[in-house]
Amino acid sequence: MWGGRFNEQVDALMAQFNNSFSFDRRMWREDIRGSIAWARQLARVGVISAEERDTLVDGLNMVYAEFADGRFEARETDEDIHTAVERRLGELVGTVAGKLHTGRSRNDQVATDVRLWTLGAIRRIDDRLRALQTALLAQAETAGAALMPGYTHLQRAQPVLLAHWLLAHFWPLQRDRERLADCAKRTATLPLGSGAIAGTPLMVDRTALAVELGMTAVSPNSIDAVSDRDFIAEFLFCAALIGTHLSRLAEDMIIYSSAEFGFVTLADAYSTGSSLMPQKKNPDSFELLRGKAGRLTGDLIAVLTMLKGLPSAYDKDLQEDKEPLFDAADTLELALPVAAGAVATARFHPDRMRAALDDAMLATDLADYLVARGVPFREAHHIVGRLVREAEQRGVALSALPLEVFLAAHPVCEPDVLQVFDFDRSVAMRRVPGATAPEAVNEQIAQARRCVEER
């Protein structure tokens, strides 16, 4: 493809070092699609005849079929997916294959391929995010009015609905989907026609190329177009953040499934055992999901580090963009269905969750009681803090303090102060949009349902 200027053969180790076919071969669909579109433009501008165009398109479709059914045979000389396709095309249709690359560089060719591939990955990952959202939503709809302790700093804080906690993991995934959709808008910019750096001398219709390939715009600057990998960095950031959200869900599920909590039992299908301890049932699905966050962050850092310090236009360093990209996509395309399955088959235990509720979690409600009767919140906070300390010193629950202690705490306290110690009442009082009251959560469920149905 490029050997005419050289007097010596490439060193065998250098050839191995330079070769990317082992990993970029997965872009065969995109490479062939781009080449078919390019062949049509070559015919439109008169570089090849209609007959030659048809020969090239037919040949490329034959190469496509060989890849699709696993018959494609690679050669040691296949430096990358582009050379592999062109080499096989030449074997099938003869010397006319040599005209296909007219006016095109591998610089704009690979930039086009990887954008097309990334757009496909975004669609697949969005589908899997939606499936995980659906699993969380189904559990939330089933949970009804079940209560659980809400935690901050992993300390008991306030009672919340189980459904509210489940949906707390739904909305980060919705933001992930929105970020990916936004990333897709910038990814769908066509570099083809930019050549190596200065643009092609052929008056191809780049807008028509973009339309044929499902792109929404053409790149405005050829130098930028062949070196722009912003979309990969952006995709990898989205992937790393998805990993972080999966890690948070996993951490909660791991903790809540432990014997010390007992809030949820994971299905056998998403658990493993111990080679030594017969009694063990380990939450390996969620532990691996938690671990993948580090891998996804590593993929992002690898690409950002590679991009730092590059001069403008194309450099071979950019070949290093694909393995982190492919790895991140592969990781999520497996991790997300595992997460969805593990969530969908998990069995929650509302009775154990309610048993874990503690009267001290209603201390804020007691402060609210005082505030409703005109006591400044900071003073109310201090008063309730003293009552909590009094209960701790007596070794009793906050609600078990004698009524006289509450009445003596502040003149506004009346016997009805003990009504504060009702977990269901506490939850029901938090009715603002986004809060944990049943009516607020029902509206949240309806909103979440619209999100998954609208795709």
UniProtKB/Swiss-Prot annotation:
Gene3D superfamilies: Fumarase/aspartase (C-terminal domain), Fumarase/aspartase (Central domain), Fumarase/aspartase (N-terminal domain)
Gene: argH
Subcellular location: Cytoplasm
Pfam families cross-referenced by the UniProt entry: ASL_C2 (PF14698), Lyase_1 (PF00206)
Pathway given in the UniProt record: Amino-acid biosynthesis; L-arginine biosynthesis; L-arginine from L-ornithine and carbamoyl phosphate: step 3/3
Source domain of life: Bacteria
Record field: catalytic activity: 2-(N(omega)-L-arginino)succinate = fumarate + L-arginine
Keyword ATP-binding attached: no
The protein's enzyme class: lyase
Gene Ontology molecular-function annotations: argininosuccinate lyase activity
Family, as annotated: Belongs to the lyase 1 family. Argininosuccinate lyase subfamily.
GO biological process: arginine biosynthetic process via ornithine; L-arginine biosynthetic process
Principal location listed in the UniProt entry: cytoplasm
Name of the molecule in the record: Argininosuccinate lyase
UniProt cross-references to PROSITE patterns, sorted A to Z: FUMARATE_LYASES (PS00163)
Cellular component annotations (GO), alphabetically ordered: cytosol
Keywords of the record: Amino-acid biosynthesis, Arginine biosynthesis, Cytoplasm, Lyase
NCBIfam families: argH (TIGR00838)
